[in-house]
Amino acid sequence: MSQRPDTIIIGAGIAGLATGCYAQMNGYDTLILEQHTIPGGVCTAWRRGGYILDGCIHFLMGCGSDQGFHQRYREVGALEGNRLIHAEHYLSFFDESTERSLTITRDLDRLAHDLRTLAPADGGFVDRFTVGIRAMQGYDVDVMQARSLMRPVPAPVHLWNARHLIPHFAGNRISLEALGTRVRDPFVGWAMSNLFVPEAPVPFIFAVLAQLTLGELAVVEGGSLNFSLGMARRYETLGGQIVYGADVTEILIENDRAVGVRLSNGAVYRADRVISAADGYTTIFELLGGRYTTRSIRARYERWPLFAPLLLISYGVACEFPNVPPTSVIRLQRPLSIAGQTKPRLVFRVFNYDTTLAPPGKTVVQVYIQTDYDWWEALRKDRARYEQEKARIAADVLERLEHHLPGIAAHVEVTDVSTPHTFYRYTRNYRGAFEGWLVTPRTIRHALEHALPGLQDFYMIGQWTEPGGGIPVVIDAARRFVQTLCHQDRKPFRTEAEVTAP
């Protein structure tokens, strides 16, 4: 690349890497500045004592070879050298008080049968729910089209292209939490509310479960970092350059134009345009000093709901649990007490399906608990208490897991606890929100602006401009963004997808 790139991209997360790939494909000379020592942002994994602990992908949508998202993954190199492990299960629900359970697999007929058995008075609901899933089978999910269909008045072209889906979108512009209230059976209602975050719109879960039934949900063997490393390799092969350990502290402005950035070490990089794929709040209110905002932008960061920050508790275990579903949601008989809050639910994953993450005969178990950001930020100032609380929670959670994974406590070799501050420290995500704006029936309708008012040659990309975030969404958004740049510069948009399928 030349000494001075025409485009600087802040952040080598998925959005930054995808933007860089598509920009390089189209003749732009780009430089990515990343504050961490590795690419990927939230899409990462790390090693502890012979175990690989995955911090990101629960399921990757659009992994069918004929899916548009699958083509996007290939275009940006995410699948090159990586093997996909296709999901056979989605979630298993268990209520400790009643010992009732429900497991959702690829078999939609089995799901319908199990729901009717559990909730015989809810037959009408079961029919509508499974019809909604079937309607999405074979449908190539398009972000813009789905977003349009969730609006009160969808765009005519989207109405026509997805006309068979209209009844399922129009009648379900509600959250999963609201869906659960329509079920008479309390256990099934609870399960419906917890199919994803309770605030998520129902059509989203129709799409997820439809892809599950067709074998189009997957994870990347070896952990999420492999996905990111594939994209970084692709970007560098296309001529792009990544500078690691580059902590951007200021976006340089001249005459209301972005002309470069300054790093924490004083180094300055200049370019014709600056694209921030970093945290939205940090970008707008710190790197730009809050100079280019509107009332609506400020209100968004003050009031819009965020994905709740997480406690991620990982155990490297010297045994396997071959008959346990990959992901379980437990309704606890004795709620946990964490960060001053009562937690009646426990979600855990068992990584038996990926033998590369642990030595032979061993596996990784991970627990996810939503928690309070401010509580942990206050506690971390007292390092001793911070570490004590992490250890207390890890021990308490392990005791609860023993009921569901007999023998686990005696075989734990590694324990690792990530708090909301850990997420913030490694990714700078606002208030530890790992996926940005919470996906709700309201927020999913919006595609937010890439530019800021009054500022030229500057753009934002990533989960803070795409409510709900997620890997396929931000890759697709990066592709559309570079298409827009090409249109502005009067050049044809092109891609260079790998010819050989992974």
Regions found by a protein language model. Give the residues of each.
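Extreme N-terminal leader/targeting segments of oxidoreductases
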Residues: 1-7, 25-26, 493-502
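A conserved FAD-binding loop/helix module that cradles the flavin
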Residues: 57, 463-486
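Active-site/ligand-binding neighborhood in enzyme catalytic cores
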Residues: 134-238, 245, 426-441
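C-terminal segments that line or cap access tunnels to active or ligand-binding sites in enzymes
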Residues: 318-421
